[in-house]
Amino acid sequence: MGGLQKKKYERGSATNYITRNKARKKLQLSLADFRRLCILKGIYPHEPKHKKKVNKGSTAPRTFYLLKDIRFLLHEPIVRKFREYKVFVRKLRKAYGKAEWTGVERLRDNKPGYKLDHIIKERYPTFIDALRDIDDALSMCFLFSTFARTGKCHVQTITLCRRLTVEWMNYVVTSRSLRKVFLSIKGIYYQAEVLGQLITWLVPYQFAHDHPTDVDYRVMATFTEMYTTLFGFINFRLYQTLNLVYPPKLDSKAESELKAEHEEDYAMDSESYLEKLSALSASLARVVATVEEEENQLDNFPTEEEDQENMQAREKEQKEQEAQKRLFEGLKFFLNREVPRESLAFILRCFGAEVSWDKSLCIGGTYEVTDETITHQIVDRPDMDKQYINRYYIQPQWVFDSVNAKMRLPVEDYFLGTMLPPHLSPFVEEKDGDYVPPEKLKLMALQRGEKPVQEEDEEEEDEDEEEDDDVDDEEFTEEKNLKKMEDTRAQGKTLSVKVTPGKVKPWETGSVGNKVRLEQEEKAEEKRLAIMMMKKKEKYLYDKIMFGKKRTTREVNKLTAKRKAHEDASKAQKKQKKAKKQ
């Protein structure tokens, strides 16, 4: 009655997957080319639910891909280009072996190439999709831009990554999109808001580093190849939204200001323009000169109370954001040669400040250290020989902390030689019941407009409290001794009959405290009964939630106790030092 009976492993999940070797043979590609193709197209291996069935009863470790993904790759134009390149390499090797140099030149001129434009359009149908997926591209391009020009990576890739990252930084500066900065062990984390999307990326520190041997640079280079194409599309579109010329050009006025006397000493002619752009100290040229327009304001429509509250909250948030964009506006900074120039210049320019540095350090310095209009000089050394009275000498952390606090923090904590406050991460948001460090509480008080208590006053208060405690202890011991004496005197006069005081029930009295207590007892009883009436699943979930809350409370108490012990130890050390001095 039925059709032919199918053999084992010819139906079901066994037919949905294909091994890597079979897929490679189907596409007629080498393993390296197959990996490149999968990275570029976004095809990843899958772990089958029933691995033994898919592996036809074998338990040997194998990599599986979905069969539909491999069929999708069969029609990819890049596969043909990979085959052409393989033939090109074979012909080139033959020409080298026969010493046919004219043939070598001809082959090099006709080297097969390919573009990834169609893959980018296929993987990211809309511009917002591309923006959401740009975090990894930014981090990878910034990493490659810091590489030394050795044989590990192609020089063209490093140069391209450097150009694209400089274009991105100039866009963020012009649009003032930067929101958060954090200095970590890995590097500097930045977060910008671009067209409503929060984009976070990591920039490594500008240190000389050796290339690790346990990293596959071919895989990284393949990812970078795709990311640079994507990055180019995004930069072009973003520059269009701001009416900027792409590729970016300096404003004619700014370019004349940056014209150095001995420009050829700093960089070659081919690199000088990129160096000027990477200085981030000048404005970019626009397609059409923009006329200053009034700031866009939200229209007010008569709405219900909830909608009105939401609108007011949005207006307040927009005002705070506009104020944050102008955080350093009107300030003039000078960077000493020992501070990280690029990161500080990038951050300060993002918030409207003017920045300069020593002209012998880098192209782009617009004014000298002797300029009397400088308001802040950023220094990372214990002391300065020559200081000007009309400016603040601060450590670099003040800039990063002020950006995260969305306000200009007091400069007294960041003077030369002072112990810096801890650098708090802006990416950590405490929930109810979480441990909040005292420095964060102090910062929140500053944001509310409250004046924090000085440390010296706190120390004096602590000393006064300790003295009061000593006096109280003495009084308490004296009272205790007096009571003992009275008890011994009254022992002979005690009566044999004892009167026990009666207990009044809380519901029999009409006091406010008893009513509150009665309500609390009723609520506790209702809660207990509700827990008793829960189903088994609900009870399990409730117990899990309560266990999590208790665990967080224990952790908070542990951290608070550690902090208190640390503060007590530091206070004891200070007292010992004072006692030694006296």
UniProtKB/Swiss-Prot annotation:
Positions with biased composition (Acidic residues): 294-309, 455-477
Keyword vocabulary terms for this entry: Coiled coil, Nucleus, Ribosome biogenesis, rRNA processing
Biased segments, Basic residues type: 572-582
Species of the source: Salmo salar
Domain of life: Eukaryota
Protein's UniProt name: Pescadillo homolog
Membership in a protein family: Belongs to the pescadillo family.
Any single GO CC term annotated in Swiss-Prot or TrEMBL for this entry: preribosome, large subunit precursor
Name of the coding gene: pes1
Compartment annotation: Nucleus, Nucleolus; Nucleus, Nucleoplasm
Residue ranges of the TM segments: none
Gene3D superfamilies: BRCT domain
CDD domains in the cross-refs: BRCT_pescadillo_like
Residue ranges of coiled coil: 277-329, 517-582
MF GO annotations: ribonucleoprotein complex binding; RNA binding
Biological-process GO terms, alphabetical: maturation of 5.8S rRNA from tricistronic rRNA transcript (SSU-rRNA, 5.8S rRNA, LSU-rRNA); maturation of LSU-rRNA from tricistronic rRNA transcript (SSU-rRNA, 5.8S rRNA, LSU-rRNA); regulation of cell cycle
Primary localisation category: nucleus
Region (Disordered): 294-317, 445-511, 554-582
Function: Component of the PeBoW complex, which is required for maturation of 28S and 5.8S ribosomal RNAs and formation of the 60S ribosome.
InterPro entries for this protein: BRCT_dom, BRCT_dom_sf, PES
Subunit structure, interactors included: Component of the PeBoW complex, composed of bop1, pes1 and wdr12. The complex is held together by bop1, which interacts with pes1 via its N-terminal domain and with wdr12 via a high-affinity interaction between the seven-bladed beta-propeller domains of the 2 proteins. The PeBoW complex associates with the 66S pre-ribosome.
SMART domains the record matches: BRCT
Residue intervals of the BRCT domain: 323-416
Biased composition (Basic and acidic residues): 445-454, 478-490
